[in-house]
């Protein structure tokens, strides 16, 4: 996984509810853990745009509910700062479910995704309709 160019402020922590931005059948996801976070004692792991997280499906089709899956954060409400000084924030917190090869499980992604996600995950960028 390559480093992001933007200064991403981590806007989500363990237990946060995010919307699912693809058509896998899941509607709402709960963040269980963050990949690669080795924190301090009693400190919640935080996640931001482009981070890979483990999620549990809280709302969706009966086949998808209560499954534990991997996902990538593609939108967050907390603003992030880009190298040119602009700040970007979205209307909601959203994630895309991925498989073990880091390919999206769905065939389409609803809504825009951040450019930082497109740089790190090319397969998600090719599926997305809008990159901001």
Swiss-Prot record:
InterPro entries membership: Ribosomal_uL14, Ribosomal_uL14_arc, Ribosomal_uL14_CS, Ribosomal_uL14_sf
SUPFAM superfamilies: Ribosomal protein L14
PROSITE patterns referenced in this protein's UniProt entry, alphabetically: RIBOSOMAL_L14
GO cellular component terms given for this protein: cytosolic large ribosomal subunit
Annotated GO biological process: translation
One term of GO molecular function: structural constituent of ribosome
CDD domains assigned to the protein according to its UniProt record, in alphabetical order: Ribosomal_uL14
Pfam family, one: Ribosomal_L14
Subunit and interaction comment: Part of the 50S ribosomal subunit. Forms a cluster with proteins L3 and L24e, part of which may contact the 16S rRNA in 2 intersubunit bridges.
Biological role stated in the UniProt entry: Binds to 23S rRNA. Forms part of two intersubunit bridges in the 70S ribosome.
Record's protein name: Large ribosomal subunit protein uL14
Organism: Haloquadratum walsbyi (strain DSM 16790 / HBSQ001)
Lineage: Archaea, Methanobacteriati, Methanobacteriota, Stenosarchaea group, Halobacteria
Gene: rpl14
């Amino acid at each position: 996984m390559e480093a992001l160019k933007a200064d991403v402020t981590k806007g989500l922590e363990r237990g946060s509810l995010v919307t699912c931005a693809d058509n896998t059948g899941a509607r709402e996801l709960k963040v269980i853990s963050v990949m690669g976070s080795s924190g301090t004692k009693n400190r919640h792991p935080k996640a931001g745009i482009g981070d890979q997280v483990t999620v549990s499906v809280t709302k969706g089709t009966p086949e998808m509910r209560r499954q534990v899956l991997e996902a990538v954060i593609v939108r967050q409400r907390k603003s992030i700062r880009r190298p040119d000084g602009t700040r970007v924030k979205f209307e909601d917190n959203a994630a895309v479910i991925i498989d073990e090869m880091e390919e999206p499980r769905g065939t389409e992604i609803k809504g825009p995704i951040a450019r930082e996600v497109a740089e790190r995950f090319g397969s998600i960028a090719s599926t997305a309709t809008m990159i901001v």
